[in-house]
């Protein structure tokens, strides 16, 4: 006889797993960069590469790409290399981070919503 396993809980990461946040992250990071005088034309694909280690590292990665580093190279920033290794000053990074936090705080749910099928999945797990 086959025994069915029953779980009492399921744990998910919200950002990028349950919720599709990439549009709001992209708009917010570009606006933060624009407000602080930096390159502000990053695509959703670029921004997907920037995030994963928090907003601070994402801002630093954007500044490194602005300096000419590849997405592959900046993937090491915040993991095995510091922002200083890419010539990113604390002053520049902190300005972008502050502008991002302020803008994203006001616009974090402009386009964010659950990925298709997520609500049905959660109801099924209930």
Describe the role of every protein-language-model region.
Residues 1-3:
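Eukaryotic N-terminal low-complexity, Ser/Thr- and Lys/Arg-rich leader segments
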């Amino acid at each position: 006889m086959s025994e069915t396993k029953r779980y009492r809980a399921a744990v998910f990461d919200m950002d990028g797993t349950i919720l599709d946040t990439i549009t709001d992250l992209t708009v917010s990071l570009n606006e933060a960069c624009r407000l602080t005088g930096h390159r502000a034309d990053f695509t959703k694909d670029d921004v997907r590469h920037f995030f994963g280690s928090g907003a601070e590292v994402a801002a630093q990665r954007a500044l490194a790409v602005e300096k000419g580093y590849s997405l592959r190279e900046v993937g090491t920033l915040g993991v095995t290399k510091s922002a200083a290794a890419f010539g990113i000053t604390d002053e520049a990074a902190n300005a972008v981070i502050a502008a991002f936090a302020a803008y994203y705080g006001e616009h974090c749910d402009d386009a964010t919503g659950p990925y298709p099928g997520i609500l049905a999945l959660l109801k099924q797990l209930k």
